């Protein structure tokens, strides 16, 4: 009987000891400084390399600062984003070039290939000189039919441009500006030109819809839509008292290329598209 009591007493003492040890350990653990939960990782800022290829709109003809038109302006806009570390740009704009000439440079210019390969995004302007040179060639005999061949050639050239850029860099997003009618404010009765521009822009947009990582940038709505109507001014010719409407987004020297305000609008359209896609 004494042995049983001794065994029970020893077991009870052991259990009490275990409880005390567990209590002390638990108290010690609670007193230790708990690691603070990790705060959300700050998103790493991105360095952006933008390559612009095209005609006089890419070169920036009409920009009073002679600083690359929409290219310098989109660089400034992108650097305001919290997620962007820095922005570098390359401008391969050549005034007067048709779409076939731009395509040839994309395919053969080693500098363009190098920059496109390293680009995060590529911006294109093309097609305007295809129309202008067709008008110059046909002169007084020009008609809607005159542009059929030029439009078909433009379509094929644009497809090849997109394909070649994608070969150089399949991850780069391509943005393609549409065309605008510079004559709408000054020759509102010239409906054929607006019809022609709509057809070309529709063709461009259709091609881009079938191209991965490509976005169409419509700008005719800026140069000739309600935005222009709300900001345009008028002047009166002293000789014949004729009222002339002035487009606030066109360069006064030629009334064809964008001015500073026009390039700012082009950059804004591109900026909004980039924010949506990137």
Enumerate the language-model features and the residues they cover.
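Hydrophobic membrane-insertion alpha-helices, especially the h-region
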Residues: 9-26
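Mobile gating loops/cap/lid regions near enzyme active sites that modulate substrate access
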Residues: 221-253
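Structural recognition of the beta-strand scaffold that forms the well-ordered cores
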Residues: 49-53, 88-93, 120-125, 173-178, ...
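Histidine-centered active-site loop/cap adjacent to the catalytic His
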Residues: 241-278
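Surface-exposed cleft-lining segments at the edges of enzyme active sites
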Residues: 95-99, 131, 138-153, 185-193
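Substrate-gating cap/lid alpha-helix
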Residues: 13, 182-221
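Serine-esterase "nucleophile elbow" of acetyl-processing enzymes
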Residues: 29-93, 112-114
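Oxyanion-hole/transition-state-stabilizing segment in secreted/luminal serine hydrolases
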Residues: 104-149
